[in-house]
């Protein structure tokens, strides 16, 4: 996808895969040539898993359309929700493709590690009606559940920040309110 985190790691060998097709080409090359071209490769890091699924959706739509283009009454899919007959079957096929590729890497002797983005999601407890926030992944829960079920460990990093509002001295001439900015007081 459009992640460039590898730029900040000294000595890392990285292959930018901005399309899912490129991801498949790179991983297939590693799988096919592990012993000859990549004998010391131990792990592939996917930065980020949510971006991988984002670039995978248009790939799956195109693949689905190519596979069915000559069929009578076929209406090309424009989104993943329309692919594979709808009802989340497009997402399920994309999950299958991603998981199969990760399994092939593992069988070739290459582990995988992925990073992802997190977000805060507000929920209401069904019994008490209380609202609460939880930290979760910034991707479809369907995709996350599939990856979570194939992972040995999942960690979520969270930074607890204390914020304060500070006046910066500028006053709005109409409302007479001073302009404020938010500053980080502490992080842990």
Predicted regions and their residues:
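Conserved P-loop
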Residues: 1-46, 50-55
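Short, low-complexity, polar/charged sequence segments that are solvent-exposed and flexible
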Residues: 14, 63-65, 174-176
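Noncatalytic linker/hinge segments flanking ATPase motor cores
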Residues: 20, 36-38, 85-98, 152-161
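P-loop NTPase motor core
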Residues: 43-145
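Phosphate-binding/switch region of NTP-binding enzymes
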Residues: 112-188
């Amino acid at each position: 996808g459009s992640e460039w985190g590898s730029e900040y790691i000294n000595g890392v060998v990285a292959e930018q895969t901005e399309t899912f097709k490129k991801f498949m080409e790179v991983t297939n090359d590693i799988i096919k040539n592990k012993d000859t071209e990549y004998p010391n490769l131990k792990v592939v890091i996917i930065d980020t898993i949510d971006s991988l699924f984002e670039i995978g959706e248009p790939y799956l739509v195109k693949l689905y359309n190519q596979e069915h283009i000559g069929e009578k009454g076929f209406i090309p899919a424009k989104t993943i929700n329309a692919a594979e007959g709808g009802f989340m079957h497009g997402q399920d096929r994309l999950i299958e493709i991603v998981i199969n590729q990760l399994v092939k890497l593992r069988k070739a002797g290459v582990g995988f590690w992925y990073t992802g983005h997190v977000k805060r999601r507000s929920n209401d407890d069904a019994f008490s009606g209380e609202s609460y926030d939880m930290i979760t992944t910034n991707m479809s829960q369907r995709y996350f559940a599939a990856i979570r079920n194939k992972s040995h460990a999942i960690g979520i990093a969270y930074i607890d920040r204390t914020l304060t509002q500070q006046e910066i001295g500028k006053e709005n001439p109409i409302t007479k309110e001073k302009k404020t900015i938010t500053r980080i007081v502490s992080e842990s």
